[in-house]
Amino acid sequence: MAQSELNAANLALRLVGNRAVLTTLADATAEGYACTALIDDCKKSLLRMHPWNFAVKRKKIIPYQDVAVSDVTFVSANLIEVTHTATTYVAGNYVTLTGIAGATVANGTWEVASILSTTVTRLTTVDIPNIGTLGTYTAGTTDYIRRSPAFDYSYLYALPSDNIRILSINGDYDLDAYRIESGFILSDDSVLEVRYIYDVTDYTTMDPLFYQCLATYLAYNLCDHLTASDGKKNELHVYLYGGQGKRGIMPQAKFVDGSEDSLQQMGASEWVDSRGSGTGLM
């Protein structure tokens, strides 16, 4: 049977011992409601537990761009427009302006408020009153109240929108080199090369062992909603994590996945994760 969100839910129901077969996760049944409520959270939890190879993504984040004072138009006390080389900025990105000699107060980290064209971006910040000649404020433009970190680090980056877990930044696994706080990456580096676990939505790309673990983990959580049997829940716990002289499918899946990486490709924490037995639910 093809791997899909719906088929994973139906597999979980079979593991619970439920005879229902969902035709869609939107089925107006107790089984449909329970699966819809739980499956995405179960998937994200399992993705965070291990650096699964199928879920690793790389992204380069470059917030820096040199601009001249002639490229900057002051719109209001905390809003500017910048003309620049074409980029793929989107609202919510953070960018850093540097080298603006004639309006040094504009240098720093700003948040993208809106994209006016491929080469004109409207940026916003706070706590800079009267930074230049005020222009006409565009009604409806959203002002944000975030900017660079108050101390310790030079730059603040939004986490990738599909991030589940950061593995390394610029090849560094040392947390002193960066921090993850309030959904942002704090770093002194002006360019970030990020390796991270992303939120996999295409079930066909999932490792088959992970897919089996997901169905089992979902079944374990469904027990509280669909059955009063503690025995079934304990049985699924043993099947997933091991115990009672049995080896669970989760430790096996982690071991197989980890065996496909060399130590040179993995950080110390990833190596430990890949071989951890995972004896309890997280």
Regions found by a protein language model. Give the residues of each.
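Glycine-enriched, solvent-exposed interface loops adjoining structured elements
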Residues: M1-A68, T141-M282
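Small/polar beta-strand repeat architecture
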Residues: D66-R146
